[in-house]
């Protein structure tokens, strides 16, 4: 199983609609024409953008539980403050949930891995997502962690992560076949049990 090239990614995006909102080249400027974090097709991956809505984790809500419980979604969701804008300031040692601008449709013989951009990593910002499973479709929810001791600025509609695609033989049971709980998610999706 080898990582797929730009030519393969472009073909799948254009012919199979694997990436809705696909940009066929690297874009290195923001919406104002100023230098920005690159997004679009790269040599062996696709650099995706995040939307302008950020769910900022906060531990200052007095009505929320004193801990995060992934099995008690109602209590956990009270820890988030929703912010809309062209950027987001992530507090030190905290994180933000957001999602990709692009909508992905993974074929049943393709799995994706989402990795952070080196520019952010060099500022103490790290991304966490799970594998993008064969047969899954939706906007990718991304967790952006600020591991530095200072607030960090993250930009909407600019490059946030790179998706690598791996093709293999068809799986026996895809994410869609299993009826995965995040199938078809739109926008930022909090944890589900």
Regions from the language model: what does each represent?
Residues 1-193:
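Non-catalytic terminal segments and appended small domains
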């Amino acid at each position: 199983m080898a990582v797929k090239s730009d030519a393969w990614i472009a073909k799948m995006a254009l012919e199979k609609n694997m990436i809705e909102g696909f940009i066929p080249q690297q874009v290195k400027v923001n919406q104002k024409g100023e230098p920005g974090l690159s997004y679009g097709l790269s040599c062996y991956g696709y650099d995706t953008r995040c939307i302008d809505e950020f769910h900022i984790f906060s531990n200052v809500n007095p009505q929320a539980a004193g801990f995060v419980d992934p099995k008690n979604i109602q209590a956990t969701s009270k820890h988030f403050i929703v912010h809309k804008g062209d950027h987001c300031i992530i507090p030190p040692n905290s994180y933000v949930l957001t999602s990709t601008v692009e909508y992905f449709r993974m074929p049943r013989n393709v799995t994706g891995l989402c990795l952070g951009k080196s520019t952010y990593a060099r500022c103490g910002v790290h991304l966490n997502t799970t594998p993008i499973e064969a047969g899954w479709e939706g906007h990718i929810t991304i967790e952006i962690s600020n591991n530095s001791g200072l607030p960090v600025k993250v930009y909407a509609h600019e490059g946030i992560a790179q998706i690598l695609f791996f093709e293999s033989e068809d799986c026996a049971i895809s994410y869609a076949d299993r009826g995965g709980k995040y199938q078809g998610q739109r926008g930022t999706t909090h944890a589900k049990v």
